[in-house]
Amino acid sequence: MKLKFKHQKFQEDAAKAVCDVFGGQPYKTFDYQVETRKKDGQTSFEKFTGFRNHPIVPQLTDEIVLKHIRDIQRAQQIKPSEALEGKYNLTIEMETGVGKTYTYIKTIFELNKRYGWCKFIIVVPSVAIREGVHKSLEIMKEHFASDYSTPLSYFIYDSKQLGELNAFVTDSKIHVMIINSQKFNCLLYTSDAADEL
């Protein structure tokens, strides 16, 4: 049985709102020289290109981002934020059962379309939700392929699957890494593990 997904305005509005926060950011891809480590611990630079999201341009100041957020909040009759919650720590809230997963996948495609961003990490609270997100991406892949010409690759983080990590770094198409929060925090806050990521 094949599932059919309807385009719903509130989901499109949510994706647009997230993109509008970064209004003024130009469409750019950002390539860089990839660093690899040899087994003996020595660092070497390979002669291949990696891709990452282009940094937020300096003209898009915190004040401008906060203004964009407040404009979006006022349009939705939400009390405007007094300050940013951190460097672009956006909280997007939706009711249960209204298609949050669909909406954030759509948002990924829209951020790519508007700004050229192509690297996304979905951090989930549990292994069960991680598996559910992976399945949702699999189910919705064809649906989004009909709306967007950019292919999307996705995988569950596994430090033993270096091919997936290599593709995440070196490929210019949209890549989504799914990781549970415990592993993400371990990689983020452990110096030895941070080198692994």
Regions found by a protein language model. Name each.
Residues 147-188:
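Inter-Walker segment of RecA-like/P-loop motor cores
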Residues 118-140:
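Conserved Walker A/P-loop ATP-binding site and its immediately adjacent core
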Residues 70-83:
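Pre-Walker A adenine-sensing motif
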Residues 1-73:
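Helicase-associated low-complexity/disordered flanking segments
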Residues 189-197:
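Conserved small/polar residues in nucleotide/adenosyl-binding loops
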Residues 11, 104, 133, 178-180:
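Conserved structural-core and active-site-/substrate-pathway-adjacent residues in large, well-folded domains
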Residues 102-115:
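Walker A/P-loop NTP-binding motif
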Residues 87-104:
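Walker A/P-loop
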